[in-house]
Amino acid sequence: MRIILLGAPGAGKGTQAKIIEQKYNIAHISTGDMIRETIKSGSVLGQELKKVLDAGELVSDEFIIKIVKDRISKNDCNNGFLLDGVPRTIPQAQELDKLGVNIDYIVEVDVADNLLIERITGRRIHPASGRTYHTKFNPPKVADKDDVTGEPLITRTDDNEDTVKQRLSVYHAQTAKLIDFYRNFSSTNTKIPKYIKINGDQAVEKVSQDIFDQLNKR
């Protein structure tokens, strides 16, 4: 099973990706995680990527395809994989097609923009552990302090409202074209994947079950 998982920033697709990975025993390939690891390394490339993300822009197609190509060649992808964060553009989709990557399903977790903005701007992070809180939906016991260590929580630099709105604008523009691209796939060597749209403004368990119900119809 080969899945592309779509969802705007804050839609909860990262959570769903982990659940799908465990349910179907397929590899979760998150370009976001791989990019964050590169940034954390402090390398020249990492610094360049940080500037791009802080501005609310997208990472280059060339870089994304390179890391995905390397990743899907690993043995744990033999049973299938879930692509999280790629493809985001038509050129990325075309490059995947050239690599012979056939996709079975496109699953989009859909949440209204106003709810996404509220979700993202309220996020607070404990840098050392990665623990995530929310000022409204999952507040720490003490405001702006990690529950376990008592250390200060931070807001990611790209979680401010202006940057979030820019990211959503880019996402919608790119995703609409991407879905049309796959719906109109004419490659003789590639089957047309099934497009599934899921309401993401529900409990995590309900979103997961809706996804499973659709995938199990195959």
Curated annotation (Swiss-Prot):
UniProt main location, coarse: cytoplasm
GO MF assignments: adenylate kinase activity; ATP binding
Compartments it resides in: Cytoplasm
GO cellular component terms given for this protein: cytoplasm
Region annotation (NMP) ranges: 30-59
Sorted UniProt keywords: ATP-binding, Cytoplasm, Kinase, Nucleotide biosynthesis, Nucleotide-binding, Transferase
Disulfide cross-links: none
This enzyme's EC code(s): 2.7.4.3
Binding site for AMP: T31, R36, E57, L58, V59, Q92, R156, R167
Residue span of region LID: 122-159
Keyword Transferase recorded: yes
Gene3D superfamilies named among the record's database cross-references: P-loop containing nucleotide triphosphate hydrolases
EC category name: transferase
Pfam families: ADK, ADK_lid
GO BP field: AMP salvage
Entry-linked InterPro entries: Adenyl_kin_sub (IPR006259), Adenylat/UMP-CMP_kin (IPR000850), Adenylate_kinase_lid-dom (IPR007862), P-loop_NTPase (IPR027417)
Classification via CDD domains: ADK
Record's subunit section: Monomer.
Function recorded in the entry: Catalyzes the reversible transfer of the terminal phosphate group between ATP and AMP. Plays an important role in cellular energy homeostasis and in adenine nucleotide metabolism.
PANTHER family the record matches: NUCLEOTIDE KINASE
Homology family: Belongs to the adenylate kinase family.
Protein name: Adenylate kinase
